[in-house]
Amino acid sequence: MGSIVKIRDVKLGEGIPKIAVPLVGSNEEEIMEEIAGVKTTKLDIVEWRIDYYKYVEEVEKVKKLLQKMRKNLNNIPILVTFRTAKEGGKREISLEYYIELNKAIAATGNTDMIDIELFAAEDEAVKKIVEELHEYNIKVIMSNHDFHKTPHKDELISRMCRMQQLGADIAKIAVMPCSTKDVLELLSATCEMKCKHNDTPIITMSMGTLGVITRLAGETFGSALTFGSAKAASAPGQLEVNELYKVLKLISAYR
């Protein structure tokens, strides 16, 4: 049994992988429409991808919309993510604003988790961001995304262990495979993390059509969360959420 992180009524790191659905609307109307749709799906967590939100550089608008989302989502956990352009996101912002924005979001009390990128800054600065978010009882998913390649297994493990050392509650890595061997590399790293470095739950995925199996086999290999789309996918290879749920349940039933 590895580490378990509880967010409201959701336990990450236990049993069937949980499902997060990203919201990728560019304005309030689109986002609230997405929320109305996702509440009827088989999800566990809602991820607000604020890099898609056109007013993301206006903190007060972000906070106001987050408050409205929290009210509408009832007890569904919220993960807020600003994905930087260099890791596949929609836009780039300064490091200073990245820190300011995430701290302001944490201080509202209207989110449960915040994604912080491993390579957002130097290690000490990233560690400090995590410590400050923890002061608001926020769970931190520390992440790294490579949309071009799959690093060697040892490098994947090294990055996830580094996330744990910097205070992450959950370590996440997503990579792009160029071959089936790359997919196996990711699955092997996931399995080794689960068996030897289970200080935190982990989230891993191999993106694109080649890597779809990694979004389904988390219970077997050790990935605690998978991402499904309700409308538009936020990453290549994401499956429709209700179809994803059916497959996860089927796999779990035969374990």
UniProtKB/Swiss-Prot annotation:
The protein's annotated pathway: Metabolic intermediate biosynthesis; chorismate biosynthesis; chorismate from D-erythrose 4-phosphate and phosphoenolpyruvate: step 3/7
Protein EC: 4.2.1.10
Top-level taxon in the UniProt lineage: Bacteria
Keywords associated with the record: Amino-acid biosynthesis, Aromatic amino acid biosynthesis, Lyase, Schiff base
GO molecular function, one term: 3-dehydroquinate dehydratase activity
Claim: Lyase is one of the keywords in the record: yes
Record bears the keyword Lyase: yes
InterPro entries: Aldolase_TIM (IPR013785), DHquinase_I (IPR001381), Type-I_3-dehydroquinase (IPR050146)
Catalytic activity reported: 3-dehydroquinate = 3-dehydroshikimate + H2O
Gene Ontology biological-process entries: 3,4-dihydroxybenzoate biosynthetic process; amino acid biosynthetic process; aromatic amino acid family biosynthetic process; chorismate biosynthetic process
Positions that bind 3-dehydroquinate: 47-49, 83, 215, 234, 238
Catalytic machinery residues: 145, 172
Coiled coil start-end: none
HAMAP family per UniProt: AroD
Assembly description: Homodimer.
PANTHER family: 3-DEHYDROQUINATE DEHYDRATASE
Its job: Involved in the third step of the chorismate pathway, which leads to the biosynthesis of aromatic amino acids. Catalyzes the cis-dehydration of 3-dehydroquinate (DHQ) and introduces the first double bond of the aromatic ring to yield 3-dehydroshikimate.
Family to which this protein belongs: Belongs to the type-I 3-dehydroquinase family.
Name the record gives this protein: 3-dehydroquinate dehydratase
Organism name: Clostridium kluyveri (strain ATCC 8527 / DSM 555 / NBRC 12016 / NCIMB 10680 / K1)
Lineage: Bacteria, Bacillati, Bacillota, Clostridia, Eubacteriales
